[in-house]
Amino acid sequence: MLKALFGDPNTRKLNKFQSLVTETNLLEEEIKKLSDEELKRKTDEFREELEKASNDRELEEILDEILPEAFALVREASLRVLGMRHFDVQLMGGIVLHKGQIAEMKTGEGKTLVSTLPAYLNGLTGKGVHIVTVNDYLARRDAEWMGQVHRFLGLSVGLIQSGMSPEDRKKNYACDITYTTNSELGFDYLRDNMATSMAEVVQRPFNFCVIDEVDSILIDEARTPLIISGPIDRPTEKYIQASQIAKQLVKQEVEDGPGDYEVDEKARNILLTDEGYKKAEQLLGVKDLFDQDNPWAHYIFNAIKAKELFTKDVNYIVRGGEVVIVDEFTGRVLAGRRWSDGLHQAIEAKERVEIQQETQTLATITYQNFFLLYPKLSGMTGTAKTEETELEKVYNLQVTIIPTNRPSQRYDLPDAVYKAERGKWMAVAEEVEELHQKGRPILVGTTSVEKSELLSNLLRQKEIPHNLLNARPENVERESEIVAQAGRKGAVTIATNMAGRGTDIILGGNSDYMSRLKIREYLMPKLVKPEEDELAVNVPSLGGKRSRPQGFASDKKVKTWKASPDIFPTELSEETVKALKEAVKIAVDQHGQQSLGELEAEEKIAIASENAPTDDIVIQKLREVYKKIRAEYEIFTSKEHNEVVELGGLHVMGTERHESRRIDNQLRGRAGRQGDPGSTRFFLSLEDNLLKIFGGDRVARLMDALQVEEDMPIESGMLTRSLEGAQKKVETYYYDIRKQVFEYDEVMNNQRKAIYAERRRVLEGLDLKEQVLQYAEKTMDEIVEAYVNPDLPPEEWDLNTLVSKVKEFVYLLQDVAPSDIEDMTFMEMKNFLHEEVRKAYEVKEQEVDRVRPGLMRDAERFFILQQIDTLWREHLQGMESLRESIGLRGYGQKDPLIEYKQEGYEMFLEMMIDIRRNVVYSLFQFKPQGQPQAV
C-alpha cells in the first residue's frame, strides 16, 4: 500500500543520487583534456578547499560539493592507469558509500573499482580511510591494483598484512588510504590499548571505513569476539580424562528418555541429566563436579561438546598434529584462531594430538562494537537486503540496491528435493555428468570439506575431471587458479562456500590471470629469494599417499612456481617465449639473481598487467610481453567464451540450503555475471541439517507420507515453503542471538571505552601528576567516609582507625595524629587530608626526582598502566563468569540483562576504586635505587 503511494524507497534514493551522476558525466569531457600533471594538481586544489573547513560538519559539506568533480577525476585516472572506466551504476555505488550506507552490488559488477571513488574523496582530508577486506590476499591485491589510481593522483596508499612489524604498521596507517583485513584492524586496536608508550601505538583516530563483503564481517562474524590472550596453567591430564569419560556417557535420544546428557543442536549446547551427573562423578571418583577445589564440570561439558557438536572435516581439520578451525561461512581455515574456554583443548584431547596451553583473555572486542567506533562507516556486498533490518538497527546502516549494468540473464531453476541424502548426491553427480558432456562449465557449492570430498569421489568413479576447492592446504594454494578457470568449457569445480573468494569466474577462462601465471612461472624462480618460500610444504593427502601441492617440487621444500599445464589454453609461439625470456633476463640484470622478496616480485607482475604509467624498465618489458601472451591466449578464450554462452553459460549447483539465504544468494550470484547467461539449481534432501534442526515435525510427517524412492525428486509447494520458513526461522534465531550478544557486549563496550580513554590519557602523559593527586584525594575521602558517620555524635567517630588507615596508604603522613582532626567537621577533615596528601606528594616527588629528573612522571605512568591492565584483565574474567551465571536469574522472574547491567556496573566501579587505591599505595611505597634507573 505505502509502496503504491510513495514509490519504492530504493528507487527514490537512486533518483536522488542520479543528479550527481549526471553532473559527474557532464564534467567528463573537460577532465579528459587535462594532462597527467594537471590531473594531479587537482588533488592539491581539492585539499586547499578542504582546509577552509573549521569543523567536521563543514568538512562533510565541502566533500559533498566537490564530489562530482572528484569522481570524474578518479574515473579519468582509472581509465588512464588501469584501462577501466567506471560505469554510471559504479558512480552510483560510490555515492552510496560516501554517504555512509551499504551498496548492494551483484557479483561481477566491479565492487573493487567502486571503492576507489569514496576512498579518494575522503582520503583528501588526510584523516585516513580504511578499506577492509576479508583476507590478506585480497587486501594486497586491491592495494597493488586499485592503489595505482590513488598514487597516480598523489595520495599515499598503505597496506597492513599479518606478520608486519609495528614500525611498518605505523607507517602504513599514516597513509591517506590503508588496505587491510578486519582481523588485523581489530587486533591492532586491542594491541594499541595494551601499549606502554605512545611510540608503540600504530593506529590514528578512526575516520572513514569501507568494508568489502560487509555482510560477512558485520553479520556472519558478529558473534566472534577478537581476543588477545596470555597463557594460564591448567592440567592437561584433566582434558584427556574428561574425553575418556565423555566416550562412556550416552546421549539421550528422546526427551525424558534414558541417557546421560541431552544435546541442543539449535543452541549448540549440552545438558547433563541427573543420571549423567551421577555417572560422571562415579567414573571420576569425586563427590561433586562443581567442587571449587577440584572442579570437573567445565572439562566434562567441553568434552561432550567436542564429541557431539564438533565434527572433524566440517568444523575443523587436523593438520600437522594441530586442530585448525574451518570458517563455516567461507570454507577457509582460520590459522592461528582457537576456540576459547578450554573447548579447543577438549577437541585436541578427542583427536589425540598435543594439548596446547589454555589462555586467559587480556583484551577483547566484538566486530559489532569495533566498527561502531568509526564516525563514518560504509560497505559493499552482493547480498545485504535479506539482513537489512539488522544492519539498520545495530549499525545504523541503510542498504541501497544498485541496479546491474546489463540486465540479468540468469535462470534459477526450482529446487530438487530428495528423501534421502544418498539419493541427492547421486542426482548431483548425474546432472554434472549430463552437463559436462555438453561442455557447460559447472560450479558445485558444498557446505563442508567432508561433503566436497564425498562428491569428488563420486565424480572420480564417473571419470569426470574436476577441481576441488576447500580448506585443505593443498587446495588453498591453487585457489585463484581454480576459480579463474571455473568458467572454461567443460570445467567442473567443487567449492566449499564461495564467500569472499576474490577472483571472478569469466566464461571461457580468465586470459588476464593465465597471462600473469605464465609470467610468474618464468620470472619467480629467477628473481625470488629461496628463503622466502615459507609456504613450500608437503602435505599428506587422503588415503595416506603424499600428494604434491600445486607449485611445489615433490621431495624438497622448494617452490617450482609451475602451474598445472592444463590451465593454459595453448602453447605460446616461439617468438613470445623468446620475448618472455628476454624480459626475465632484463629483470635479473636489474635486480640480481634471486634477490627479491615474493611480495615485491608479485607486485611487479601485478603492475605490469595494468596500464599505470611507469619509468621502471623491468615493468615496461614485462608489460610488453604480458600483452603478447594475453593476445595469444585471448584468441582461444574469446572463442571459448562464445561457445560457452551458446551452451547457456555457467551452471551453479547448491547441495544444501545454508542457514542463511544470503550465502545461498552469494553462490547463485556466481552465475550470470555482467549480463552473461547462466542457471542455478539447489539439490536438497530431507536429511539435510537445516531441515533436521529447524524444519521440525512437519517435514518428518511429510517424509512418512511420501512413499517415494530415495532417488526420485519430490516437488511440493508445502516443502518449498517449509524450506523458506526454516531458513527464515534460522535467520531470526541467529539475529536474536547476535542482538543478545550485542546488548550484553554493549555493557562491556561502555566500560571498555571508559578504561581505554583513561589509558590513552595516561599514555599521552597529560597531567599525570594532577591525576594521581585526584586519586589520592579521592582515597582520603573514602577513608573518612568509611570511619566517620556525620549523623553520629563526634565522640562515636573512630578517628584512631581512620588515622592508621591514612598512614597505611601514605607512610609520609606518620606525624598526623587523631588529635589533629578531632575538632574538625566531616568536610574539614576531608580538606585537611587533601592538603596533607598534596604536601606529602611534593616531598615524594623531590625524593624520587633526585635519583633522575623526571623519574616521578615515568613512575606515575608505569604504576597507573600496570594497575589498569592487571585489574581490567581480572575484570574481564569476572564479567565472563557473571554472564555465564546470570542466565539462571531468568528462572527467578528477573530480567537477566538488567541484572547483568547493574552488577556489571557495580563491578566496574569497584575496579576503578581498586585502580585508584593501588596506584596511590604503590607510588608512595616506591623507593628507587640510589643510581639512575628507568622504571
Swiss-Prot record:
Record PROSITE patterns: SECA (PS01312), SECA_MOTOR_DEAD (PS51196)
Membrane topology: Peripheral membrane protein
Gene Ontology terms: biological process: intracellular protein transmembrane transport; protein import; protein targeting; protein transport by the Sec complex
Top-rank taxon, per record: Bacteria
GO function term, MF aspect, one: protein-exporting ATPase activity
Compartment list: Cell inner membrane; Cellular thylakoid membrane; Cytoplasm
Major enzyme class: translocase
Record NCBIfam families: secA
Assembly: Monomer and homodimer. Part of the essential Sec protein translocation apparatus which comprises SecA, SecYEG and auxiliary proteins SecDF. Other proteins may also be involved.
Physiological role: Part of the Sec protein translocase complex. Interacts with the SecYEG preprotein conducting channel. Has a central role in coupling the hydrolysis of ATP to the transfer of proteins into and across the cell membrane, serving as an ATP-driven molecular motor driving the stepwise translocation of polypeptide chains across the membrane. Probably participates in protein translocation into and across both the cytoplasmic and thylakoid membranes in cyanobacterial cells.
Protein name in UniProt: Protein translocase subunit SecA
Species assigned in the record: Gloeothece citriformis (strain PCC 7424)
